[in-house]
Amino acid sequence: MAPFSRPHHPMIRTRFAPSPTGYLHIGGARTALFSWAFARHHGGQFVLRIEDTDIARSTPEAVQAILDGMAWLDLNHDEGPFYQTQRLYRYKEVIEQMLASGDAYHCYCSTEELDEMREAQRARGEKPRYDGRWRPEPGKTLPVPPSGVQPVVRFRNPTDGTVAWKDLVKGTIEFSNAELDDLIIARADGTPTYNFCVVVDDWDMRITHVIRGDDHVNNTPRQINILKALGATVPEYAHLSMILGDDGTKLSKRHGAVSVMQYFEEGYLPEAVINYLARLGWSHGDAELFDREQFVEWFDLDHITPSAAQFNTEKLRWLNQQYIKAADDTRLAGLARPFLIRNGATLDDGPDLAAVCALVKERAATIEALADAATLFYRVLHPTPELLAQHVTAEVRPALADLATRLETLEWERGAISAAFKETLAAHGLKMPKLAMPVRVLVTGEPQTPAIDATLELLGREKVLDRLRAAL
Protein backbone atom coordinates (compact mmCIF):
# COMPACT_ATOMS: atom_id res chain seq x y z
CA MET A 1 0.00 0.00 0.00
CA ALA A 2 1.16 3.54 -0.69
CA PRO A 3 1.95 5.52 2.48
CA PHE A 4 -0.30 8.47 1.58
CA SER A 5 -4.01 8.27 2.46
CA ARG A 6 -6.39 8.28 -0.51
CA PRO A 7 -9.69 10.20 -0.25
CA HIS A 8 -12.80 8.80 -1.93
CA HIS A 9 -13.28 12.03 -3.92
CA PRO A 10 -9.78 13.15 -4.91
CA MET A 11 -9.23 16.87 -5.27
CA ILE A 12 -6.92 18.33 -7.87
CA ARG A 13 -3.32 17.92 -6.78
CA THR A 14 -0.36 19.28 -8.72
CA ARG A 15 3.34 19.17 -8.02
CA PHE A 16 6.56 20.98 -8.79
CA ALA A 17 9.46 18.57 -8.78
CA PRO A 18 12.80 20.26 -9.51
CA SER A 19 16.15 18.49 -9.48
CA PRO A 20 18.59 20.40 -7.23
CA THR A 21 21.46 20.40 -9.69
CA GLY A 22 21.32 24.15 -10.31
CA TYR A 23 19.33 27.27 -9.61
CA LEU A 24 15.61 27.83 -10.11
CA HIS A 25 15.62 29.15 -13.68
CA ILE A 26 12.90 30.94 -15.64
CA GLY A 27 11.51 27.77 -17.21
CA GLY A 28 11.30 26.01 -13.86
CA ALA A 29 9.71 29.05 -12.24
CA ARG A 30 7.02 29.17 -14.95
CA THR A 31 6.30 25.46 -14.45
CA ALA A 32 6.02 26.02 -10.71
CA LEU A 33 3.74 29.04 -11.24
CA PHE A 34 1.37 27.23 -13.62
CA SER A 35 1.20 24.16 -11.35
CA TRP A 36 0.58 26.36 -8.30
CA ALA A 37 -2.04 28.49 -10.06
CA PHE A 38 -3.92 25.47 -11.43
CA ALA A 39 -4.19 23.99 -7.94
CA ARG A 40 -5.24 27.33 -6.42
CA HIS A 41 -7.81 27.99 -9.16
CA HIS A 42 -9.51 24.66 -8.45
CA GLY A 43 -9.20 24.82 -4.67
CA GLY A 44 -6.72 21.95 -4.86
CA GLN A 45 -3.32 21.27 -3.34
CA PHE A 46 0.19 22.03 -4.54
CA VAL A 47 3.02 19.67 -3.60
CA LEU A 48 6.74 20.51 -3.63
CA ARG A 49 9.05 17.56 -4.30
CA ILE A 50 12.84 17.67 -4.55
CA GLU A 51 14.09 15.04 -6.99
CA ASP A 52 17.56 14.60 -5.52
CA THR A 53 18.43 11.00 -6.41
CA ASP A 54 21.30 12.22 -8.63
CA ILE A 55 23.59 12.31 -5.61
CA ALA A 56 26.67 13.36 -7.59
CA ARG A 57 25.04 16.50 -9.00
CA SER A 58 22.53 17.47 -6.28
CA THR A 59 23.77 20.00 -3.74
CA PRO A 60 22.33 21.55 -0.55
CA GLU A 61 23.08 24.97 -2.05
CA ALA A 62 20.91 24.21 -5.08
CA VAL A 63 18.09 22.96 -2.84
CA GLN A 64 18.25 26.21 -0.87
CA ALA A 65 18.32 28.27 -4.06
CA ILE A 66 15.12 26.54 -5.22
CA LEU A 67 13.43 27.11 -1.86
CA ASP A 68 14.58 30.75 -1.84
CA GLY A 69 13.22 31.31 -5.34
CA MET A 70 9.87 29.75 -4.48
CA ALA A 71 9.64 31.82 -1.29
CA TRP A 72 10.51 35.06 -3.11
CA LEU A 73 7.80 34.41 -5.70
CA ASP A 74 5.45 33.41 -2.84
CA LEU A 75 4.54 30.11 -4.50
CA ASN A 76 3.51 28.46 -1.26
CA HIS A 77 3.12 24.69 -1.18
CA ASP A 78 0.55 22.71 0.80
CA GLU A 79 2.73 19.62 1.26
CA GLY A 80 6.47 19.05 1.23
CA PRO A 81 9.13 19.58 0.41
CA PHE A 82 9.47 15.82 -0.02
CA TYR A 83 12.96 14.53 -0.81
CA GLN A 84 13.38 11.45 -2.96
CA THR A 85 16.51 10.45 -1.06
CA GLN A 86 14.30 10.07 2.01
CA ARG A 87 11.96 7.69 0.15
CA LEU A 88 14.45 5.09 -1.11
CA TYR A 89 12.80 2.46 1.09
CA ARG A 90 9.53 3.02 -0.78
CA TYR A 91 11.06 2.67 -4.23
CA LYS A 92 12.79 -0.57 -3.17
CA GLU A 93 9.47 -1.88 -1.86
CA VAL A 94 7.69 -1.23 -5.17
CA ILE A 95 10.55 -2.72 -7.20
CA GLU A 96 10.32 -5.92 -5.15
CA GLN A 97 6.58 -6.03 -5.80
CA MET A 98 7.14 -5.62 -9.54
CA LEU A 99 9.80 -8.34 -9.61
CA ALA A 100 7.40 -10.65 -7.78
CA SER A 101 4.53 -9.89 -10.17
CA GLY A 102 6.66 -10.32 -13.28
CA ASP A 103 6.34 -6.66 -14.29
CA ALA A 104 10.10 -6.24 -13.82
CA TYR A 105 13.11 -8.52 -14.21
CA HIS A 106 16.85 -8.68 -13.61
CA CYS A 107 19.20 -7.92 -16.49
CA TYR A 108 22.86 -8.95 -16.28
CA CYS A 109 24.13 -7.23 -19.44
CA SER A 110 27.45 -5.48 -18.98
CA THR A 111 28.17 -2.05 -20.39
CA GLU A 112 30.37 -3.69 -23.01
CA GLU A 113 27.58 -6.04 -24.08
CA LEU A 114 25.13 -3.16 -24.42
CA ASP A 115 27.65 -1.18 -26.49
CA GLU A 116 28.21 -4.15 -28.81
CA MET A 117 24.44 -4.65 -29.08
CA ARG A 118 23.90 -1.05 -30.18
CA GLU A 119 26.81 -1.10 -32.64
CA ALA A 120 25.45 -4.22 -34.30
CA GLN A 121 21.98 -2.67 -34.53
CA ARG A 122 23.39 0.49 -36.11
CA ALA A 123 25.33 -1.63 -38.60
CA ARG A 124 22.03 -3.26 -39.61
CA GLY A 125 20.37 0.16 -39.92
CA GLU A 126 18.23 -0.42 -36.85
CA LYS A 127 17.42 1.94 -34.01
CA PRO A 128 19.80 1.22 -31.08
CA ARG A 129 17.88 -0.31 -28.17
CA TYR A 130 17.96 -3.06 -25.58
CA ASP A 131 17.12 -6.35 -27.31
CA GLY A 132 15.38 -8.02 -24.37
CA ARG A 133 17.86 -10.88 -24.00
CA TRP A 134 17.17 -11.17 -20.25
CA ARG A 135 13.43 -10.57 -20.59
CA PRO A 136 11.45 -13.63 -19.47
CA GLU A 137 9.03 -14.97 -22.09
CA PRO A 138 6.95 -18.16 -22.21
CA GLY A 139 9.09 -20.96 -23.65
CA LYS A 140 12.24 -18.82 -23.63
CA THR A 141 15.42 -20.12 -22.01
CA LEU A 142 17.34 -17.34 -20.31
CA PRO A 143 21.13 -17.28 -20.04
CA VAL A 144 22.75 -18.42 -16.83
CA PRO A 145 23.32 -15.40 -14.57
CA PRO A 146 27.06 -14.67 -14.43
CA SER A 147 28.62 -15.01 -11.01
CA GLY A 148 29.66 -11.88 -9.17
CA VAL A 149 27.61 -9.56 -11.38
CA GLN A 150 25.00 -7.29 -9.82
CA PRO A 151 22.06 -6.99 -12.22
CA VAL A 152 20.00 -3.93 -13.04
CA VAL A 153 16.21 -4.14 -12.85
CA ARG A 154 14.26 -3.46 -16.03
CA PHE A 155 10.57 -2.73 -16.44
CA ARG A 156 8.77 -5.22 -18.66
CA ASN A 157 7.28 -2.79 -21.15
CA PRO A 158 4.37 -3.97 -23.32
CA THR A 159 5.58 -4.96 -26.79
CA ASP A 160 2.36 -4.49 -28.73
CA GLY A 161 -0.27 -1.79 -29.00
CA THR A 162 0.17 1.88 -28.28
CA VAL A 163 0.29 4.18 -25.30
CA ALA A 164 -1.57 7.45 -25.76
CA TRP A 165 -2.79 10.35 -23.70
CA LYS A 166 -4.74 13.52 -24.33
CA ASP A 167 -2.21 16.16 -23.45
CA LEU A 168 -3.96 19.21 -22.00
CA VAL A 169 -1.67 21.53 -23.97
CA LYS A 170 -0.54 19.62 -27.05
CA GLY A 171 -3.56 17.43 -27.74
CA THR A 172 -3.46 13.66 -28.27
CA ILE A 173 0.04 12.16 -28.26
CA GLU A 174 0.62 8.50 -29.12
CA PHE A 175 3.64 6.19 -29.03
CA SER A 176 3.94 2.66 -30.30
CA ASN A 177 5.01 0.32 -27.50
CA ALA A 178 7.33 -1.35 -29.99
CA GLU A 179 9.40 1.88 -29.96
CA LEU A 180 9.91 1.72 -26.20
CA ASP A 181 12.51 -0.66 -24.85
CA ASP A 182 12.56 -2.10 -21.34
CA LEU A 183 13.52 0.82 -19.14
CA ILE A 184 16.05 0.35 -16.33
CA ILE A 185 14.20 1.17 -13.09
CA ALA A 186 16.99 0.24 -10.65
CA ARG A 187 20.74 0.43 -11.21
CA ALA A 188 23.17 -2.33 -10.32
CA ASP A 189 23.86 -0.67 -6.97
CA GLY A 190 20.15 -0.80 -6.16
CA THR A 191 19.41 2.91 -6.56
CA PRO A 192 16.18 3.66 -8.45
CA THR A 193 16.21 5.68 -11.66
CA TYR A 194 14.52 9.00 -12.36
CA ASN A 195 11.56 7.75 -14.39
CA PHE A 196 10.69 5.12 -11.80
CA CYS A 197 10.89 7.46 -8.79
CA VAL A 198 8.66 9.98 -10.55
CA VAL A 199 6.00 7.34 -11.14
CA VAL A 200 5.98 6.09 -7.54
CA ASP A 201 5.94 9.64 -6.19
CA ASP A 202 3.08 10.77 -8.43
CA TRP A 203 1.14 7.65 -7.44
CA ASP A 204 1.80 7.91 -3.71
CA MET A 205 1.21 11.65 -3.60
CA ARG A 206 -2.08 11.32 -5.51
CA ILE A 207 -1.02 13.78 -8.20
CA THR A 208 -3.95 14.36 -10.56
CA HIS A 209 -2.31 16.78 -13.01
CA VAL A 210 1.34 16.77 -14.08
CA ILE A 211 2.28 20.16 -15.56
CA ARG A 212 5.87 20.22 -16.81
CA GLY A 213 8.16 21.13 -19.70
CA ASP A 214 7.81 19.38 -23.03
CA ASP A 215 11.32 17.97 -22.68
CA HIS A 216 9.50 15.30 -20.62
CA VAL A 217 7.15 14.21 -23.43
CA ASN A 218 9.33 11.19 -24.28
CA ASN A 219 9.32 10.11 -20.62
CA THR A 220 5.53 10.15 -20.41
CA PRO A 221 4.68 6.91 -22.30
CA ARG A 222 7.16 4.97 -20.18
CA GLN A 223 5.76 6.47 -16.99
CA ILE A 224 2.18 5.73 -18.05
CA ASN A 225 3.05 2.09 -18.74
CA ILE A 226 4.65 1.70 -15.30
CA LEU A 227 1.63 3.33 -13.64
CA LYS A 228 -0.69 0.93 -15.44
CA ALA A 229 1.44 -2.04 -14.39
CA LEU A 230 1.10 -0.88 -10.79
CA GLY A 231 -2.65 -0.54 -11.13
CA ALA A 232 -2.32 3.16 -10.38
CA THR A 233 -4.51 5.97 -11.67
CA VAL A 234 -2.79 7.76 -14.53
CA PRO A 235 -2.73 11.54 -13.99
CA GLU A 236 -3.55 14.08 -16.67
CA TYR A 237 -0.52 15.59 -18.41
CA ALA A 238 0.11 19.11 -19.66
CA HIS A 239 3.45 19.69 -21.36
CA LEU A 240 4.60 23.30 -21.67
CA SER A 241 6.60 24.34 -24.71
CA MET A 242 10.10 25.66 -24.30
CA ILE A 243 10.99 29.30 -23.70
CA LEU A 244 13.10 31.03 -26.34
CA GLY A 245 15.44 33.96 -25.79
CA ASP A 246 15.11 37.41 -27.34
CA ASP A 247 16.93 36.13 -30.44
CA GLY A 248 14.63 33.15 -30.99
CA THR A 249 17.06 30.50 -29.73
CA LYS A 250 16.54 28.34 -26.64
CA LEU A 251 16.77 30.42 -23.46
CA SER A 252 20.19 30.00 -21.87
CA LYS A 253 22.80 31.75 -19.73
CA ARG A 254 23.87 33.99 -22.57
CA HIS A 255 20.42 35.64 -22.58
CA GLY A 256 20.98 37.17 -19.15
CA ALA A 257 19.75 36.06 -15.76
CA VAL A 258 20.45 32.43 -14.98
CA SER A 259 18.33 32.11 -11.85
CA VAL A 260 15.13 33.65 -10.56
CA MET A 261 17.04 35.04 -7.58
CA GLN A 262 19.25 37.00 -9.97
CA TYR A 263 16.15 39.07 -10.78
CA PHE A 264 15.78 39.70 -7.06
CA GLU A 265 19.42 40.82 -6.92
CA GLU A 266 18.90 43.15 -9.90
CA GLY A 267 15.91 44.80 -8.27
CA TYR A 268 12.85 43.26 -9.86
CA LEU A 269 9.64 42.99 -7.84
CA PRO A 270 8.32 39.43 -7.40
CA GLU A 271 4.81 40.43 -8.46
CA ALA A 272 6.22 41.79 -11.74
CA VAL A 273 8.13 38.57 -12.39
CA ILE A 274 4.98 36.55 -11.61
CA ASN A 275 2.95 38.72 -14.00
CA TYR A 276 5.58 38.29 -16.71
CA LEU A 277 5.93 34.53 -16.24
CA ALA A 278 2.15 34.18 -16.41
CA ARG A 279 2.19 35.74 -19.89
CA LEU A 280 4.91 33.40 -21.16
CA GLY A 281 2.75 31.02 -23.14
CA TRP A 282 -0.60 31.83 -21.51
CA SER A 283 -2.99 34.73 -22.03
CA HIS A 284 -6.35 36.09 -20.94
CA GLY A 285 -7.51 38.24 -23.81
CA ASP A 286 -5.41 41.38 -24.05
CA ALA A 287 -4.77 41.66 -20.29
CA GLU A 288 -1.16 42.57 -19.60
CA LEU A 289 -1.11 43.86 -16.02
CA PHE A 290 -2.79 41.74 -13.36
CA ASP A 291 -2.04 40.65 -9.81
CA ARG A 292 -1.69 37.06 -8.64
CA GLU A 293 -5.26 36.90 -7.31
CA GLN A 294 -6.62 37.88 -10.72
CA PHE A 295 -4.26 35.41 -12.39
CA VAL A 296 -5.46 32.54 -10.18
CA GLU A 297 -9.07 33.43 -10.97
CA TRP A 298 -8.41 33.45 -14.72
CA PHE A 299 -5.88 30.64 -15.08
CA ASP A 300 -6.72 27.55 -17.09
CA LEU A 301 -4.83 25.12 -19.28
CA ASP A 302 -7.02 25.80 -22.33
CA HIS A 303 -5.29 29.11 -23.02
CA ILE A 304 -1.72 27.83 -22.88
CA THR A 305 -0.25 28.01 -26.35
CA PRO A 306 1.41 24.81 -27.66
CA SER A 307 4.06 26.87 -29.47
CA ALA A 308 7.24 28.15 -27.88
CA ALA A 309 7.12 31.35 -25.82
CA GLN A 310 9.70 34.07 -26.35
CA PHE A 311 11.37 35.77 -23.42
CA ASN A 312 11.66 39.54 -23.85
CA THR A 313 13.86 41.30 -21.31
CA GLU A 314 12.63 44.75 -22.28
CA LYS A 315 9.02 43.70 -21.75
CA LEU A 316 9.90 42.40 -18.29
CA ARG A 317 11.63 45.71 -17.48
CA TRP A 318 8.56 47.63 -18.66
CA LEU A 319 6.28 45.51 -16.48
CA ASN A 320 8.58 45.97 -13.52
CA GLN A 321 8.51 49.73 -14.05
CA GLN A 322 4.71 49.72 -13.91
CA TYR A 323 4.78 47.81 -10.64
CA ILE A 324 7.42 50.13 -9.16
CA LYS A 325 5.34 53.19 -10.08
CA ALA A 326 2.33 51.69 -8.29
CA ALA A 327 4.26 50.37 -5.27
CA ASP A 328 4.08 51.78 -1.75
CA ASP A 329 6.92 54.26 -1.22
CA THR A 330 7.83 52.93 2.22
CA ARG A 331 8.19 49.43 0.76
CA LEU A 332 10.34 50.80 -2.07
CA ALA A 333 12.54 52.57 0.46
CA GLY A 334 13.19 49.29 2.27
CA LEU A 335 14.04 47.54 -0.99
CA ALA A 336 16.27 50.37 -2.23
CA ARG A 337 18.25 50.74 1.00
CA PRO A 338 20.76 47.89 0.33
CA PHE A 339 21.42 49.21 -3.19
CA LEU A 340 22.02 52.73 -1.84
CA ILE A 341 24.44 51.45 0.77
CA ARG A 342 26.26 49.56 -1.97
CA ASN A 343 26.47 52.86 -3.87
CA GLY A 344 28.24 54.44 -0.90
CA ALA A 345 25.29 56.58 0.17
CA THR A 346 25.11 57.89 3.74
CA LEU A 347 21.44 57.48 4.56
CA ASP A 348 21.64 59.18 7.97
CA ASP A 349 22.48 62.47 6.27
CA GLY A 350 19.65 63.11 3.87
CA PRO A 351 15.90 63.36 3.31
CA ASP A 352 13.28 60.73 4.07
CA LEU A 353 14.01 57.84 1.71
CA ALA A 354 10.34 57.08 1.07
CA ALA A 355 9.82 60.67 -0.09
CA VAL A 356 12.82 60.38 -2.39
CA CYS A 357 11.47 57.11 -3.83
CA ALA A 358 8.14 58.82 -4.51
CA LEU A 359 9.99 61.48 -6.50
CA VAL A 360 12.30 59.28 -8.57
CA LYS A 361 10.28 56.09 -9.10
CA GLU A 362 8.42 57.19 -12.26
CA ARG A 363 11.37 56.40 -14.52
CA ALA A 364 12.91 53.49 -12.60
CA ALA A 365 12.67 50.11 -14.33
CA THR A 366 14.33 48.28 -11.42
CA ILE A 367 14.99 48.89 -7.73
CA GLU A 368 18.65 49.14 -8.67
CA ALA A 369 17.82 52.01 -11.06
CA LEU A 370 15.62 53.55 -8.38
CA ALA A 371 18.52 53.50 -5.93
CA ASP A 372 20.88 54.95 -8.53
CA ALA A 373 18.47 57.85 -9.07
CA ALA A 374 18.13 58.36 -5.31
CA THR A 375 21.85 58.24 -4.55
CA LEU A 376 22.40 61.93 -5.34
CA PHE A 377 20.37 62.83 -2.22
CA TYR A 378 22.76 60.98 0.09
CA ARG A 379 26.32 61.53 -1.02
CA VAL A 380 29.17 64.00 -0.95
CA LEU A 381 29.26 66.17 -4.07
CA HIS A 382 31.96 65.93 -6.68
CA PRO A 383 30.84 67.91 -9.76
CA THR A 384 33.45 67.52 -12.47
CA PRO A 385 35.47 70.52 -13.67
CA GLU A 386 33.98 69.95 -17.13
CA LEU A 387 30.41 70.28 -15.81
CA LEU A 388 31.30 73.40 -13.83
CA ALA A 389 32.98 75.02 -16.83
CA GLN A 390 30.07 74.15 -19.11
CA HIS A 391 27.18 75.28 -16.92
CA VAL A 392 28.40 77.64 -14.17
CA THR A 393 29.42 80.51 -16.47
CA ALA A 394 30.11 84.15 -15.66
CA GLU A 395 26.84 85.02 -17.43
CA VAL A 396 24.72 82.99 -15.01
CA ARG A 397 26.53 83.71 -11.73
CA PRO A 398 24.52 86.88 -10.91
CA ALA A 399 21.28 84.93 -11.35
CA LEU A 400 22.59 82.15 -9.10
CA ALA A 401 23.42 84.68 -6.38
CA ASP A 402 19.98 86.28 -6.74
CA LEU A 403 18.27 82.86 -6.50
CA ALA A 404 20.25 82.00 -3.37
CA THR A 405 19.05 85.24 -1.74
CA ARG A 406 15.41 84.50 -2.61
CA LEU A 407 15.73 80.95 -1.25
CA GLU A 408 16.99 82.18 2.13
CA THR A 409 13.67 83.46 3.43
CA LEU A 410 10.84 81.74 1.58
CA GLU A 411 8.71 78.92 2.99
CA TRP A 412 10.62 75.74 2.07
CA GLU A 413 8.13 73.91 -0.10
CA ARG A 414 8.02 73.05 -3.77
CA GLY A 415 5.57 75.73 -4.89
CA ALA A 416 7.53 78.55 -3.24
CA ILE A 417 10.83 77.25 -4.65
CA SER A 418 9.30 77.12 -8.14
CA ALA A 419 8.09 80.71 -7.72
CA ALA A 420 11.61 81.83 -6.71
CA PHE A 421 13.00 80.31 -9.91
CA LYS A 422 10.41 82.10 -12.05
CA GLU A 423 11.10 85.44 -10.37
CA THR A 424 14.85 85.02 -10.89
CA LEU A 425 14.40 84.06 -14.53
CA ALA A 426 12.23 87.11 -15.16
CA ALA A 427 14.67 89.43 -13.39
CA HIS A 428 17.64 88.23 -15.45
CA GLY A 429 15.95 87.46 -18.78
CA LEU A 430 16.89 83.78 -18.74
CA LYS A 431 15.18 80.56 -19.82
CA MET A 432 14.70 77.78 -17.24
CA PRO A 433 17.45 75.43 -18.54
CA LYS A 434 20.00 78.24 -18.30
CA LEU A 435 19.38 78.51 -14.54
CA ALA A 436 18.21 75.02 -13.59
CA MET A 437 21.20 73.22 -15.10
CA PRO A 438 23.89 75.05 -13.10
CA VAL A 439 21.78 74.68 -9.94
CA ARG A 440 21.60 70.93 -10.55
CA VAL A 441 25.34 70.69 -11.06
CA LEU A 442 26.18 72.77 -7.97
CA VAL A 443 23.65 71.20 -5.63
CA THR A 444 23.68 67.54 -6.75
CA GLY A 445 26.80 67.15 -8.86
CA GLU A 446 24.65 65.79 -11.69
CA PRO A 447 23.31 67.48 -14.85
CA GLN A 448 20.13 65.39 -14.74
CA THR A 449 17.79 65.16 -11.75
CA PRO A 450 14.07 64.96 -11.08
CA ALA A 451 12.18 68.29 -11.19
CA ILE A 452 14.53 70.89 -9.74
CA ASP A 453 12.01 72.41 -7.32
CA ALA A 454 11.13 68.97 -5.89
CA THR A 455 14.81 68.02 -5.70
CA LEU A 456 15.71 71.17 -3.74
CA GLU A 457 12.71 70.71 -1.44
CA LEU A 458 13.91 67.26 -0.41
CA LEU A 459 17.56 68.25 -0.04
CA GLY A 460 16.62 70.98 2.43
CA ARG A 461 17.36 74.70 2.65
CA GLU A 462 20.63 74.44 4.55
CA LYS A 463 22.27 71.95 2.22
CA VAL A 464 21.09 73.78 -0.93
CA LEU A 465 22.29 77.21 0.21
CA ASP A 466 25.62 75.88 1.49
CA ARG A 467 26.35 74.29 -1.88
CA LEU A 468 25.26 77.30 -3.92
CA ARG A 469 27.27 79.74 -1.82
CA ALA A 470 30.35 77.54 -1.83
CA ALA A 471 30.48 77.91 -5.60
CA LEU A 472 29.79 81.64 -5.64
Curated annotation (Swiss-Prot):
It catalyses: tRNA(Glu) + L-glutamate + ATP = L-glutamyl-tRNA(Glu) + AMP + diphosphate. Residues 122-150 are annotated as: Disordered. GO terms for molecular function: ATP binding; glutamate-tRNA ligase activity; tRNA binding; zinc ion binding. ATP binds at K253. It holds the Pfam family tRNA-synt_1c. A motif ('KMSKS' region) lies at residues 250-254. A motif ('HIGH' region) lies at residues 18-28. Keywords: Aminoacyl-tRNA synthetase, ATP-binding, Cytoplasm, Ligase, Nucleotide-binding, Protein biosynthesis. Residues 122-138 have a biased composition (Basic and acidic residues). CDD domains: GluRS_core. SUPFAM superfamilies: An anticodon-binding domain of class I aminoacyl-tRNA synthetases, Nucleotidylyl transferase. GO terms for biological process: glutamyl-tRNA aminoacylation. Transmembrane segments: none annotated. It is found in: Cytoplasm. Belongs to the class-I aminoacyl-tRNA synthetase family. Glutamate--tRNA ligase type 1 subfamily. This is Glutamate--tRNA ligase.
